[in-house]
């Protein structure tokens, strides 16, 4: 397994829909193993293939549900269903804050549906589905968003959208080709401290 560099916000691979996986699952095993390893070393709860520069509809996750139980898995060609997504300003108390390995070290309140279900193939090529509420639902929406070419900062509203744009510009994350490598570069989220 190899830890791969994580692509930062300005790269086009993050802003275009990924390609549906059509190759045999056996040809994806190294990629999926690398995705799990990269996510783990980055202390992430999810990672989409395009976040490591690969335009394929695959994401991995290791995320807690509302009771704190960890759920780990992989979805290939996922389909997302959700409850209604709120159109109001998200809470400013930290409960709606979301971060992203491709927007390193930053977090912004993000409105998400409270329930989500994902259906797709697992890393063995078997069809499966999982549903969750709260943080797990947020994780599923975030990762499928990546595969659809949507970074979570694209979904922000009001002052959070304006602040995210300023932050992205101030960090120079509008250009393609920028990356950070977990375990090599300083952890932008402060997990090393």
UniProtKB/Swiss-Prot annotation:
The protein's Enzyme Commission number: 3.5.1.88
One Pfam family here: Pep_deformylase
Cofactor details (free text): Binds 1 Fe(2+) ion.
Broad enzyme group: hydrolase
Active site per the UniProt annotation: 143
UniProt entry tagged with the keyword Metal-binding: yes
Disulfide bonds: none
Binding locations of Fe cation: 100, 142, 146
UniProt keyword terms in alphabetical order: Hydrolase, Iron, Metal-binding, Protein biosynthesis
Gene Ontology MF annotations: metal ion binding; peptide deformylase activity
Catalytic activity field: N-terminal N-formyl-L-methionyl-[peptide] + H2O = N-terminal L-methionyl-[peptide] + formate
BP terms from Gene Ontology: co-translational protein modification; translation
Cofactor section: Fe(2+)
UniProt function note: Removes the formyl group from the N-terminal Met of newly synthesized proteins. Requires at least a dipeptide for an efficient rate of reaction. N-terminal L-methionine is a prerequisite for activity but the enzyme has broad specificity at other positions.
Family: Belongs to the polypeptide deformylase family.
Designated name of the protein: Peptide deformylase 2
Native organism: Corynebacterium efficiens (strain DSM 44549 / YS-314 / AJ 12310 / JCM 11189 / NBRC 100395)
Taxonomic lineage of the native organism: Bacteria, Bacillati, Actinomycetota, Actinomycetes, Mycobacteriales
Gene that specifies this protein: def2
